[in-house]
Amino acid sequence: MAETLISPGVLARENDISFIAPAPTEAGAALLGPTVKGPVEEPTVVTSYGQYQRQFGTTFESGSNKFEFITSIAAKSYFEQGGNSILVTRVVSGSFTGATNTALTASAVASQPFALETISKGALLNNATGSNPDTAVHNSDGSINLGTADNLRWEISNVNDAQGTFSLSIRRGDDNTKSKIILESFNDLSLDPNSENYIERVVGNQTKTKSSDGEVTYISTVGEYVNRSRYVRVSSVNNPTLNYVGNDGITVGSNGVTSFSGSLPIAQSGSFQGAAGNLYNGIVPNNHFGSISNTNTQGLTAANYTDAISILENKDEYVFNIISAPGLIYYFGNHKVQLDSIISLAETRGDAIAVVDIEQYGATVSNVTAAASTVNSSYTATYWPWLQTQSATGKNEWIPASTVIPGVYAFTDGAAAPWFAPAGLTRGGIPNVIQAERKLTRAQRDTLYNSNVNPIATFPGAGISVFGQKTLQKKKSALDRVNVRRLLINLKKFVGDVSRNLVFEQNTTVTRDTFLAQVNPFLDSVVQRQGLYAYRVVMDDSNNTADVIDRNQLIGQIFIQPAKTVEYIVLDFTVEPSGATFGA
């Protein structure tokens, strides 16, 4: 019970407004595009390039050719530049499903005791011969013909009939019994739903489905148990075995038998099969890199990106500060709808900047400036020209600038802060590229920059660097610069997080002081870190009148003066005559 004063005395009370605010969430880049494998149209956080390779693959073969998707190059560039995480949304054409395990043999039941399904989707997961994509061929040592690093196999071991337990291993598809490559293992699994080691509980049984309510496309989760496996889920348990103990306290099983051997799997290994979904879905030729066209971007059409873009609208579920879909080119009419959707997505969310490519490979400066003039958004930036890099296939390929620019942003965030310009020789360098499509002259850079296109310049001895930081906003204001837009994104994210914690609190001075006690120190730190010249925060009776309070509102006004960058340096050299004196 709170202390009260009935008779004269002193009541000491305390009011703690020294809350320690969390640092702004450090979200990474959202990448949309085709991948070799992985979940389809399911935004997935990846925290290293090695993890990306395991989940989404790197290269694949089609006929006698070997390919790499631009998405893979973008992911590698981002992590090499110091990025912490990316949100990958795989785009496909056609229907893709997971592969299921080949028949698991049980000791004494007609059906297999349980079934597994790969989390990754597509026919690539079928570990089989080319003549029959749904039937794997096993060799005498237990290996599988034509297995690859991109598909899987399963193995049952350590079967204990007395205890009703067994082990499950997921192995890489190109290994063999003499040299196993075990990706993950689960031990002491049980088919008893009441057991802590019940296979669905330990491995997981969830699957994701794409749904729509007519306005928004979203991902629904089906299944009770979170997937702890990175590669498979339990799609069904056909013969659950309850751990009954007989009346004598010794015998086990509902029928009084002394073991679980009737429904347990025997020690064995096998492959996965039955997955649907081809990387190209019949689009031939599959145009990659510099050959991307209006109707063919890496074996897809631009329309294939529609649902993936829509899914990312939910800013409460998916957090990122950059979005890029390398392979979509604004110049192409069929791509324009999807890129407009990405730009609109960034504007609506208000917490990310879209990096888009304006022109196809081989365009001229006038082509680029003409295309850029059709876009007007402070949440969008474009860069030119294209760049040449070495693909994982060993070939030199041409890639659009949006492939590597998120990496430049990541480097800037790590080396300085989001409100520093991701440009120049200090922070704008682009590593691991061979050459730019064009070595721009000073006049060409001026023409591009006047049209809000950020030039990628080549300087002798200094390499290839981003040499501009404009957004595609046509109106001249502070927000026509990338560093200011990213500053605002960062500030709004922090202040928004603080404000969210105050919703449903009492509309009193205590709540206002709580807000100010967190926001003012943060803005002070931004001033000290060269992001702002000055700021002022107003949240008091002047803007929270009785009428505002009666409407259940709390109003805060934040006035800022963003720090500007040095983009033009003027140096005056004056030649003095002999005998001239210089003042102190």
What are the residue ranges of the model-derived segments?
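Short, flexible N-terminal segments of the mature chain
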Residues: 186-195
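Polybasic, low-complexity Lys/Arg-rich tracts in intrinsically disordered regions
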Residues: 106-118, 122-149
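Surface-exposed loop/edge segments in extracytoplasmic proteins
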Residues: 176-184
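Intrinsically disordered, low-complexity regulatory segments in eukaryotic proteins
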Residues: 138-161, 309-314
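Conserved aromatic
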Residues: 46, 183-186
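Structured, hydrophobic secondary-structure cores that serve as assembly/anchoring elements
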Residues: 1-124, 159-167, 171-177, 194-197, ...
